[in-house]
Amino acid sequence: MRERLCGVYVITEPSLADPLESTEQVLRGGARLVQLRAKSATTRQLITWGQAMRDRTRQYNALLIVNDRLDVALAIEADGVHLGQDDLPVPLARRIAGNRLLIGVSAETVEEARQAASEGADYLGVGPMFTTVTKPDAGTPVGPARIRQIKQVVGIPVFGIGGIQPENALQVLQGGSRAS
């Protein structure tokens, strides 16, 4: 499944747009990866949204990734889970999920990226690229140059994340992101 980790990677944000409507729109527009991210949603709401999003991503032969919640990813038969630095460690997530799920990890520094790759992460989300309103605690933007630095030390796909908008997406791609 790792070979399918390319193309536009979209992260949903229910406070900005309905996740089901936005998933449909981005898939029609060519996105190949969609991440269900809804920090304040209940488990039941995540499962409801996740099952519907899973149906849509299958129709478009796209991947569905669940943010933070390995239990939800397994329950809805998602394609992967995306873990932050304070979430479940990659080796434990891999022991629980086996090879059923892709495991992505957020990395801000080269060292975090190197560690995630050595622990068995399938891909990295590097950022924040720019200031983001959807994750106020994201930290200081690292910019697209960080992607190049990280790609020099890891052999897994790297995506830019955080604050990416149509007007700055090209900078992220030029930085070496698999897509964003």
Per-region residue spans from a language model:
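Phosphate-binding beta-alpha-beta segment of Rossmann-like dinucleotide-binding domains, i.e.
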Residues: 131-140
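Short glycine-rich anion-binding loops that position phosphate/pyrophosphate groups of nucleotides
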Residues: 87, 129-131
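Glycine-rich beta-strand-to-loop/alpha-helix junction loops that act as flexible
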Residues: 126, 159-164, 180
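Conserved N-terminal beta1-alpha1 strand-loop-helix module at the mouth
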Residues: 1-90, 94-122, 139, 149, ...
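Conserved cofactor-binding/catalytic machinery of classical short-chain dehydrogenase/reductase
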Residues: 146
